[in-house]
């Protein structure tokens, strides 16, 4: 499929579905943390998710190559991916789903700002700047909930925010290094395989592993590994290869909304009018960010 300068209905639908899955993922990770140490969960999830991705590539004859100059940036991205999710999983151990989701999905702000300076075709115009400001306001409104503040951990907040920086860095590396020569499947495998290679030996050395594992926790773990990580991120990298990074990433502002919703649904975390307002602001912000430049 050819590159596009704006996001059409099909692309928007995929991004919204992906945002729903990511919002749900925050709650699922917190549940699985009860049965697995956070670091172990990151490593074993990467390993389990890599298997169906490899099978998919073999069945559909997707190109998997390290001879295109992508090996070094791929290893770096895989290392960043490992650190990103270790930080996020610990954040979910320390703070509420709502708060960690809101901070983690601030990623489009850092990505949009960096893309403005790094990519000539992704300059921020007045409408997009206003859109970003409105979206940031939406995140701020959601964070202003008294329940979020009282249940929050400063260290957990910092971990979630650092994880969002790493997510933006990975996206930029895909755009700016030889990783862009790799297929979306290969880009994902770099991250899954490298993170598994780094983390699993580390957890064995440190003695981190299973906690109070149950059948239901195993089912949830498999769902997030196979559906959210394997299938979801394949879609994410494919969309990244078609649509402008700053525009598609703006849809991640739906992430904290769905994260807060599932936090309320699963953990009974408080939801209020501020969440409804933040959803409205996010919708307006995304509309402005996706508006085309006019002469």
Describe the role of every protein-language-model region.
Residues 2, 20, 24, 35, ...:
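Membrane-interface helix-cap regions at the ends of transmembrane helices
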Residues 42-44, 100-106, 174-196, 229-265:
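Helix-helix packing/entry segments at the starts of transmembrane helices
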Residues 21, 25-26, 54-104, 140-141, ...:
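Specific transmembrane alpha-helical segments of multi-pass solute transporters/efflux pumps
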Residues 40-51, 80, 89-123, 163, ...:
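Specific alpha-helical transmembrane segments that line the substrate/conduction pathway
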Residues 33-83, 108-114, 166-173, 188-206, ...:
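Transmembrane alpha-helices of multi-pass small-molecule transport proteins
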Residues 7-12, 34-39, 43, 66-71, ...:
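Juxtamembrane helix-entry segments on the extracytoplasmic side of multipass membrane proteins
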Residues 53, 75, 81, 106, ...:
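Hydrophobic transmembrane alpha-helices of multi-pass small-molecule transport proteins
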Residues 1-40, 79, 83, 87, ...:
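Glycine-/small-residue-enriched transmembrane alpha-helix faces in small-molecule transporters
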């Amino acid at each position: 499929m050819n590159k596009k300068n704006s996001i059409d209905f099909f692309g928007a639908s995929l991004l919204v579905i992906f945002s729903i899955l990511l919002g749900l993922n925050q709650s699922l990770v917190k549940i699985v943390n009860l049965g697995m140490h956070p670091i172990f969960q990151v490593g074993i999830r990467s390993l389990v998710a890599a298997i169906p991705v490899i099978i998919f590539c073999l069945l559909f004859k997707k190109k998997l190559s390290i001879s295109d100059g992508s090996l070094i940036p791929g290893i770096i991205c895989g290392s960043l991916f490992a650190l990103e999710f270790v930080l996020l999983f610990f954040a979910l151990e320390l703070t509420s789903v709502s708060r960690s989701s809101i901070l983690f999905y601030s990623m489009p702000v850092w990505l949009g700002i960096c893309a403005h300076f790094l990519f000539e075709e992704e300059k921020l115009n007045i409408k997009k700047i206003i859109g970003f400001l409105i979206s940031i306001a939406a995140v701020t409104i959601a964070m202003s909930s008294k329940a979020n503040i009282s249940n929050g951990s400063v260290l957990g907040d910092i971990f979630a925010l650092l994880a969002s920086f790493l997510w933006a860095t990975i996206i930029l590396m895909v755009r700016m290094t030889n990783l862009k020569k790799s297929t979306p499947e290969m880009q994902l495998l770099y991250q899954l395989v490298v993170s598994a290679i780094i983390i699993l030996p580390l957890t064995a050395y440190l003695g981190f592993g299973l906690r109070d594992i149950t059948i239901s926790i195993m089912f949830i773990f498999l769902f997030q590994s196979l559906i959210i990580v394997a299938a979801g991120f394949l879609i994410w990298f494919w969309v990244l290869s078609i649509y402008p990074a700053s525009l598609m990433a703006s849809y991640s502002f739906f992430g904290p909304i769905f994260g807060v919703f599932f936090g309320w649904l699963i953990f009974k975390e408080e939801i209020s009018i501020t969440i409804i307002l933040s959803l409205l602001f996010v919708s307006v912000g995304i509309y402005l960010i996706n508006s085309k430049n006019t002469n």
